[in-house]
């Protein structure tokens, strides 16, 4: 039985449609891999792809995408609201079916070695693949971003896991890892005050004393002139969607600010959305396995 892996590369390009189209074409170039979704954000200047495939072919398409990005994205000319350090900024592998997290760690290491050997891009391993505890957190790995990486790589504790202590001149540095599924979730505030978004992000994120399974930053969407709380939710069983939404709404109200809306980036597990519906509709004794029609149709 095939071992199924999800790969969610994040690219530092969300404005040039020709480059995005090239990434889409590359993502579809390997048999046995399906491009499930891709989304681009001009304000963030970033694109997120979601692919699934068997454990061998997913490695090939991941390498091809990193290669295409390194040849077509120049970070010396990049501007955007989202933190970034590489043309392919992050490359996580997620176990989906008949494969363990430990096996995904080995996939991450194999792909990392090839990327560095053939493309000359230094690699940091993160999350479950991290070589040391302080590298599990992507925010710590990416701190300094592209512009600060040349100096960071010379620090005693920040030698890349693969490659020399110097960045690729245009493609920067890539973080490759293995992790469990997460939701990338953004909440748009009815204000143009970035400080409010930053303050709310600080309150909810685990690293500053908030929710353990929440990562958050404040960003400014220049094209809409609004502030946004950009969130990664890394454990949906222990930290559901509705809880972060209600917390952000409560904190925003303290500033006299409302919420314009929210968005899910990429794909999300159905149960996470059903849990939110169950909470807001106050459904009693709901059984997700038995009462969702599609669960029966899909077997």
Feature locations, PLM:
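Long, contiguous binding/interaction regions
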Residues: 1-299
């Amino acid at each position: 039985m095939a071992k199924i892996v999800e790969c969610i590369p994040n690219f530092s390009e969300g404005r040039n449609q020709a480059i995005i189209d090239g990434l889409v074409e590359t993502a579809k170039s390997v048999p046995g891999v399906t491009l499930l979704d891709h989304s681009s954000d001009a304000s963030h200047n970033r694109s997120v792809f979601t692919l699934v495939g068997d454990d061998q072919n997913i490695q090939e398409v991941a390498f091809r995408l990193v290669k295409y990005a390194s040849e077509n994205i120049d970070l010396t000319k990049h501007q955007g609201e989202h933190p970034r350090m590489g043309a392919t900024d992050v490359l996580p592998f997620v176990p989906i079916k008949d494969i363990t997290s430990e096996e995904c760690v080995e996939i991450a290491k194999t792909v990392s070695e090839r990327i560095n050997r053939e493309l000359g891009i230094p690699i940091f391993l993160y999350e479950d693949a991290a070589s040391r505890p302080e590298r599990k957190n992507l925010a710590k790995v990416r701190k300094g971003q592209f512009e600060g990486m040349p100096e960071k790589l010379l620090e005693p504790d920040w030698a890349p896991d693969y490659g020399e202590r110097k960045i690729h001149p245009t493609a920067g540095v890539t973080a490759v890892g293995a992790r469990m599924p997460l939701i990338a979730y953004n909440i748009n505030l009815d204000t143009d005050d970035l400080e409010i978004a930053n303050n709310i992000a600080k309150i909810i994120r685990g690293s500053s004393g908030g929710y353990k399974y929440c990562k958050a930053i404040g960003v400014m969407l220049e094209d809409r002139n609004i502030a946004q709380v950009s969130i990664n939710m890394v454990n949906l069983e222990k930290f559901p969607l509705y809880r972060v939404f209600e917390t952000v709404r409560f904190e925003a109200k303290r500033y006299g600010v409302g919420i314009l809306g929210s968005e899910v980036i990429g794909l999300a597990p159905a149960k996470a959305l059903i849990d939110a519906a169950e909470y807001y509709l106050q459904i009693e004794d709901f059984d997700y396995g038995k009462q969702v029609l599609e669960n029966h149709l899909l077997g």
